[in-house]
Amino acid sequence: MEIIGYYESPNQQELIGKIRACDWSAARFLADLLEKGTFDETLGGWGYLFLLLDGENLISFATLTGQDAVRDESLTPWIGFVFTNPEYRGHRYAGKVLAHAEKMAAKLGYGRVYLETNHVGLYEKYGYVYLENRIDCWGEDARVLYKELEEVE
């Protein structure tokens, strides 16, 4: 198993296909952003997409971006689009991708990351703390969580 960066991969079209095949509407939205080249523009001007692969199989993925569905420029960066394929759930693979994104955020000089979700208890087990509820860009209520990051040399 390995975590790769989408933008460093020579197989971007293949990865878009794997993301689009996930049974989650947000994954299809992410695939559209990548295909149209609007990922950075839509998500705060910059971003990373990390994918955990087992050979050719997509296990899990997450993004690290300047903005997410909760629009507030004072809160940055965001981890989003966190997904683990159902057949791989229960093994904490999302935690591996989260940790990778968190490490990148720390390398970029950030001391905290944010995440918005409707799940209760899922991200808390990875050290995330509830901040508050906010209305997202679709007008829906979302829980905003954060995590303090350790400095990386």
Go through each PLM region and give its residues:
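Short amphipathic alpha-helix that is part of the acyltransferase structural core
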Residues: 1-37, 151-153
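Short loop/turn motifs at secondary-structure junctions and domain boundaries
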Residues: 40-45
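Short hydrophobic/aromatic beta-strand or adjacent loop that forms the aromatic wall/cage
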Residues: 47, 140-145
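Conserved beta-strand in the GNAT
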Residues: 49-51, 57-67, 78, 83
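Active-site beta-strand termini and strand-to-loop segments that position acidic
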Residues: 53-55, 147-148
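Helix-adjacent hinge/juxtasegments
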Residues: 68-76, 81, 86, 91-93
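Conserved acetyl-CoA pyrophosphate-binding loop and the N-cap/start of the following alpha-helix
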Residues: 88, 92-100, 110
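Conserved active-site alpha-helix within GNAT-family acetyltransferase domains
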Residues: 107, 111, 117-141
